[in-house]
């Protein structure tokens, strides 16, 4: 058995990735979210596949087909709500995974980090298109509002929007292509995850101290396989609690009304996991400026390695930067809250202040704190 595991071309790759992989001996539970994201992706692909067997991507039947899945298909309600709430669990794990990377300086693995950012954008695009498919009110108007943002691009904007729509409004062509892309993208994401892991295994994992751990490695199996398994059990417990007891708690009631192009909902808003970016978008009273701020709010992650000024890798021994990091987390929670509120006083002002704070903390305060901490520890250049 050992010989097969270590010599067989396929089994060898699996062995070097998940069994005999040398891992740092001190990585905490914050390192569990990579495997949890893998589990989320598998759940989403499987439930999505079964949903696609019954779903029809036509404007006249899409809403009814989702109702049919919930009412008439064996365990259709379970599959549908696992898929919808699975997306929420996916984003919770994503945000915690990225936050871990920021806190412990994992962004110094440049290739792994940059592929991770591309993955984040791709997952966000996939989730957005998936939200359009049930063809409820919020699906339709969400698609209309978000795709319309591209019209802010000078010269080609309007043409580009109509090209994406496949007509002069969000209609049959839009729904069909969104379904096609929503079905295809998870497989592209899977391929990118493999590349993400490939680059990670070139360097090995980071650890909470940020210090090189080559002198103290342990095999991935059984130590981290059992630890990941515990994480998976907790994730599935949380997901199934959500699915079986509070399936609609994270959804919008407006999406239980079939799409009507003649009636606009009072408050158009995306799913909770996009609210922070939506708040940043709305805080700028200019269409193009808002779109640029929206993209910058995620793309700013690509600047993290450049903005790193500290002589230490992570924040474990850097109290000033730690404080700023947790202020940033609180700031993102405020943005998430504001994104779900109507555009009126005092929410507009709070949103603008939180948006300014978000960029200021990342671009100015954290690099400055790094320099101050270097001087406090009397590091010499």
UniProtKB/Swiss-Prot annotation:
<comment type="subunit">
    <text>The cytochrome bc1 complex contains 11 subunits: 3 respiratory subunits (MT-CYB, CYC1 and UQCRFS1), 2 core proteins (UQCRC1 and UQCRC2) and 6 low-molecular weight proteins (UQCRH/QCR6, UQCRB/QCR7, UQCRQ/QCR8, UQCR10/QCR9, UQCR11/QCR10 and a cleavage product of UQCRFS1). This cytochrome bc1 complex then forms a dimer.</text>
</comment>
<feature type="binding site" description="axial binding residue">
    <location>
        <position position="97"/>
    </location>
    <ligand>
        <name>heme b b566</name>
    </ligand>
</feature>
<dbReference type="GO" id="GO:0008121">
    <property type="term" value="F:ubiquinol-cytochrome-c reductase activity"/>
</dbReference>
<dbReference type="Pfam" id="PF00032">
    <property type="entry name" value="Cytochrom_B_C"/>
</dbReference>
<keyword id="KW-0472">Membrane</keyword>
<dbReference type="InterPro" id="IPR016174">
    <property type="entry name" value="Di-haem_cyt_TM"/>
</dbReference>
<dbReference type="InterPro" id="IPR048260">
    <property type="entry name" value="Cytochrome_b_C_euk/bac"/>
</dbReference>
<dbReference type="InterPro" id="IPR005797">
    <property type="entry name" value="Cyt_b/b6_N"/>
</dbReference>
<feature type="transmembrane region" description="Helical">
    <location>
        <begin position="320"/>
        <end position="340"/>
    </location>
</feature>
<dbReference type="InterPro" id="IPR027387">
    <property type="entry name" value="Cytb/b6-like_sf"/>
</dbReference>
<feature type="transmembrane region" description="Helical">
    <location>
        <begin position="33"/>
        <end position="53"/>
    </location>
</feature>
<keyword id="KW-0496">Mitochondrion</keyword>
<keyword id="KW-0479">Metal-binding</keyword>
<keyword id="KW-0813">Transport</keyword>
<dbReference type="InterPro" id="IPR005798">
    <property type="entry name" value="Cyt_b/b6_C"/>
</dbReference>
<dbReference type="InterPro" id="IPR030689">
    <property type="entry name" value="Cytochrome_b"/>
</dbReference>
<feature type="transmembrane region" description="Helical">
    <location>
        <begin position="113"/>
        <end position="133"/>
    </location>
</feature>
<dbReference type="Pfam" id="PF00033">
    <property type="entry name" value="Cytochrome_B"/>
</dbReference>
<dbReference type="InterPro" id="IPR036150">
    <property type="entry name" value="Cyt_b/b6_C_sf"/>
</dbReference>
<feature type="transmembrane region" description="Helical">
    <location>
        <begin position="226"/>
        <end position="246"/>
    </location>
</feature>
<keyword id="KW-1133">Transmembrane helix</keyword>
<feature type="binding site" description="axial binding residue">
    <location>
        <position position="196"/>
    </location>
    <ligand>
        <name>heme b b566</name>
    </ligand>
</feature>
<comment type="function">
    <text>Component of the ubiquinol-cytochrome c reductase complex (complex III or cytochrome b-c1 complex) that is part of the mitochondrial respiratory chain. The b-c1 complex mediates electron transfer from ubiquinol to cytochrome c. Contributes to the generation of a proton gradient across the mitochondrial membrane that is then used for ATP synthesis.</text>
</comment>
<dbReference type="GO" id="GO:0046872">
    <property type="term" value="F:metal ion binding"/>
</dbReference>
<comment type="similarity">
    <text>Belongs to the cytochrome b family.</text>
</comment>
<feature type="transmembrane region" description="Helical">
    <location>
        <begin position="347"/>
        <end position="367"/>
    </location>
</feature>
<dbReference type="GO" id="GO:0005743">
    <property type="term" value="C:mitochondrial inner membrane"/>
</dbReference>
<dbReference type="InterPro" id="IPR048259">
    <property type="entry name" value="Cytochrome_b_N_euk/bac"/>
</dbReference>
<feature type="transmembrane region" description="Helical">
    <location>
        <begin position="288"/>
        <end position="308"/>
    </location>
</feature>
<keyword id="KW-0812">Transmembrane</keyword>
<keyword id="KW-0349">Heme</keyword>
<feature type="binding site">
    <location>
        <position position="201"/>
    </location>
    <ligand>
        <name>a ubiquinone</name>
    </ligand>
</feature>
<feature type="transmembrane region" description="Helical">
    <location>
        <begin position="77"/>
        <end position="98"/>
    </location>
</feature>
<dbReference type="GO" id="GO:0045275">
    <property type="term" value="C:respiratory chain complex III"/>
</dbReference>
<feature type="binding site" description="axial binding residue">
    <location>
        <position position="83"/>
    </location>
    <ligand>
        <name>heme b b562</name>
    </ligand>
</feature>
<keyword id="KW-0999">Mitochondrion inner membrane</keyword>
<dbReference type="GO" id="GO:0006122">
    <property type="term" value="P:mitochondrial electron transport, ubiquinol to cytochrome c"/>
</dbReference>
<keyword id="KW-0830">Ubiquinone</keyword>
<keyword id="KW-0249">Electron transport</keyword>
<keyword id="KW-0408">Iron</keyword>
<feature type="binding site" description="axial binding residue">
    <location>
        <position position="182"/>
    </location>
    <ligand>
        <name>heme b b562</name>
    </ligand>
</feature>
<keyword id="KW-0679">Respiratory chain</keyword>
